[in-house]
């Protein structure tokens, strides 16, 4: 199984909550975190199999755009991220999210 990282950045917290909810409901992914960037920008991060992350990000984009005032600013998927990223960036499976891991 090839593990990927998927990210959606929105303007506004309600949009990112809606996106995150839809992402974990639409595919077998694990929500590993979120980052508040500033100026209302928030990024949500999921991990899972490449195809599942792709489906998850698509569902998240659609959901965030349904929120009144919600705006998707950026999305990206990294297939097979280098293991060094996990030790520097907030994309690793933590103890808090391990119970929700889907694979």
UniProtKB/Swiss-Prot annotation:
Q: Name one GO biological process term.
A: photosynthesis
GO MF, any single term: structural constituent of carboxysome shell
Q: How does it assemble?
A: Homohexamer, might also make dodecamers. Interacts with full-length CcmM. Forms mixed heterohexamers of all possible stoichiometries with CcmK1, which might form dodecamers. Only very weak interactions with CcmK3 and CcmK4 were seen.
| Annotated keywords | Bacterial microcompartment, Carbon dioxide fixation, Carboxysome, Photosynthesis
Q: Does the keyword Transcription apply?
A: no
Q: What is this protein called?
A: Carboxysome shell protein CcmK2
Q: Which Pfam families match?
A: BMC (PF00936)
Instruction: List the record's Gene Ontology CC terms alphabetically.
Output: carboxysome
InterPro entries in the record: Bact_microcomp_CS (IPR020808), BMC_dom (IPR000249), BMC_shell (IPR050575), CcmK (IPR046380), CcmK-like_sf (IPR037233), CcmK/CsoS1_BMC (IPR044872)
Where the record annotates domain BMC, the positions are: 4-90
The UniProt function text for this chain reads:
One of the shell proteins of the carboxysome, a polyhedral inclusion where RuBisCO (ribulose bisphosphate carboxylase, rbcL-rbcS) is sequestered. The central pore probably regulates metabolite flux. Hexamers make sheets that form the facets of the polyhedral carboxysome.
| Subcellular localization | Carboxysome
Question: From what superkingdom does this record's organism come?
Answer: Bacteria
> Anything noted about its domains?
The tight homohexamer forms a pore with an opening of about 5.9 Angstroms in diameter which is positively charged. The C-terminal flexible tail, which is the most variable part of CcmK proteins, seems to be involved in packing of hexamers in layers.
Q: What gene makes this protein?
A: ccmK2
What family classification does the UniProt entry report for this protein?
Belongs to the bacterial microcompartments protein family. CcmK subfamily.
């Amino acid at each position: 199984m090839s593990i990927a990282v998927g990210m959606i950045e929105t303007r506004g917290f309600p949009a990112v909550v809606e996106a995150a909810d839809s992402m974990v409901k639409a595919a077998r992914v694990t929500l590993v975190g979120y980052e508040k960037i500033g100026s209302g920008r928030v990024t949500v991060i999921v991990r899972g199999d490449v195809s599942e992350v792709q489906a998850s990000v698509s569902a998240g984009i659609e959901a965030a755009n349904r929120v009144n005032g919600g705006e998707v600013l950026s999305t990206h998927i990294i297939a097979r991220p280098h293991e060094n990223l996990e030790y520097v960036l907030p994309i690793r499976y933590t103890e808090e999210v391990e119970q929700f891991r889907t694979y």
